[in-house]
Curated annotation (Swiss-Prot):
Complex formation: Monomer.
All copies of domain Guanylate kinase-like, residue ranges: 137-319
First-tier enzyme category under EC: transferase
The encoding gene: GK-1
Tree of life domain: Eukaryota
Record protein name field: Guanylate kinase 1
Reported phenotype of the disruption mutant: No visible phenotype under normal growth conditions, but the double mutant atgk1 and atgk2 is lethal.
GO biological process per UniProt: gametophyte development; nucleotide metabolic process
Sequence similarity: Belongs to the guanylate kinase family.
Its job: Essential for recycling GMP and indirectly, cGMP. Required for normal development of the gametophyte and embryo, in association with GK2.
UniProt xrefs under InterPro entries: Gal_Oxase/kelch_b-propeller, GK/Ca_channel_bsu, Guanylate_kin-like_dom, Guanylate_kinase, Kelch-typ_b-propeller, P-loop_NTPase
Record: residues binding ATP: 144-151, 304-305
Enzyme Commission number: 2.7.4.8
Length: 387
């Protein structure tokens, strides 16, 4: 890629970022951001994905350019960008001329998630995270052995609070069965595509079952949250372990039977399985209960000895007793003016409209950010000031 571009860098002490726009062609706007001993070139298109912004890194010590592994679903190319270096190894990127729900993004270059991925992949890594206004209720991970009643508890939640909870739609590489609809029962995916997305860090958890992949994508969980609902994930202990290791901030609940004898009685009462199948389920359940209680994955343990009482305890743990549903998530993004200048003052980004007869401002407060790559970054507060 050649030598590093000569750029002018605004000084942070003047209240401005060190992000500067550089144009090689009218429709190929790029921006450079100086972070320590590296320069990040953001813009153009990704070398393997023409629908995502490209990222290149220039190392000042070795005087070399290189392409990092880019994790997460990245933003589409735009007509221009403004960028600011934030704490926790993040770069705030504001896209010019973009739809209101696609204007704010974060490129993580040295966050805890990125550092962990660097260790795992043994390569240079960056990760994209979409910025979202407001906050949302934490997703709920519910695990427990087969026959413990967790499915019934979830159904009771969904029936009593239909507008509050939602399920993420899982991905699978198996073929659709009769009456199954893509995007409703599963997202039916090509195996090579799903394998690549798993490698790119786009899945919270996955497993191979009889030669087919099954998994929960980060985007499917975020889509439920974006709709204003609280996502419920009904997954096994291994899946919960993967979610716990991710950046998703969730509540982890494990449901236990009152005893193995009670669990065996429930399985036999179904009348749908052979003796061999029942014994296999009991062996698996015993191992799963042991791991669920002692692994440290689950912060909350429920014993389902009485369904109604267990459900009351579940609602109490989730803060649902006598409370109306209030969700602070807002996904509409920000309406940016056509022409504007951007500056930074402490934890606030000031977007100043630059028309002839206007002094309107948009103040973006980033003091309460939470979440992050490879999911959404939430907690953005916006205040419009009109003159």
């Amino acid at each position: 890629m050649g030598e590093a571009p000569a750029v002018l860098v605004d000084h942070p002490e003047n209240g401005h970022s060190n992000g500067v726009c550089v144009k090689s062609e009218p429709e190929n706007t790029e921006i450079t951001v100086d972070v320590g001993d590296r320069i990040f070139l953001i813009g153009g298109t990704h070398e393997r994905n023409n629908f995502s912004i490209g990222v290149q890194i220039y190392d000042k010590i070795s005087n070399n350019w290189f392409s990092p592994i880019v994790l997460g679903t990245g933003p589409k190319p735009s007509k221009g960008y403004s960028a600011f270096v934030l704490e926790q190894g993040r770069i705030l990127v504001i896209k010019k001329g973009s739809p209101r729900n696609d204007s704010i993004w974060f490129l993580e270059v040295d966050s805890p998630y990125v550092r962990e991925q660097k260790k795992l992949l043994r390569k240079e890594v960056v990760a994209w995270s979409k910025g979202v206004r407001g906050n949302a209720e934490k997703p709920i991970v519910i695990s427990g052995p087969s026959g413990v009643g967790k499915g019934t508890l979830i159904s009771m939640l969904m029936k009593e609070f239909p507008s509050m909870f939602g399920f993420s739609v899982s991905h699978t590489t198996r073929s659709p069965r009769s009456m199954e609809m893509d995007g409703v029962h599963y997202h039916f995916a090509d195996k090579k595509v799903m394998e690549k997305e798993i490698k790119d860090g786009k899945f919270l958890e996955f497993a191979s079952v009889h030669g087919n992949l099954y998994g929960t994508s980060i985007e499917s969980v975020e889509a439920v949250t974006d709709s204003g609902k609280r996502c419920i994930l009904d997954i096994d202990v291994q899946g919960a372990r993967s979610v716990r290791a991710s950046s998703l901030d969730a509540i982890f609940i494990f449901v236990c039977p009152p005893s193995m004898k009670e669990l065996e009685d429930r399985l036999r009462a179904r009348g749908t399985e052979t003796e061999e199948q029942i014994q296999k389920r009991l062996r698996n359940a015993e191992a799963e209960i042991k791991e669920g209680i002692s692994s440290g994955i689950f912060g909350l343990i429920l014993y389902n000895d009485n369904l109604e009482e267990c459900y009351k305890k579940l609602k109490n743990l989730l803060g649902l007793d006598g409370l109306a549903h209030v969700n602070g998530v807002e996904i509409e993004g920000i309406n940016l003016p056509i022409e504007y200048a951007v500056s930074k003052m402490e934890d606030k980004i000031i977007i100043q409209e630059t028309g002839k007869e206007t002094r309107n401002k948009i103040v973006v407060d980033i003091s309460s950010l939470n979440g992050g790559a490879p999911g959404r970054t939430r907690g953005i507060l916006v205040d419009a000031i009109k003159f």
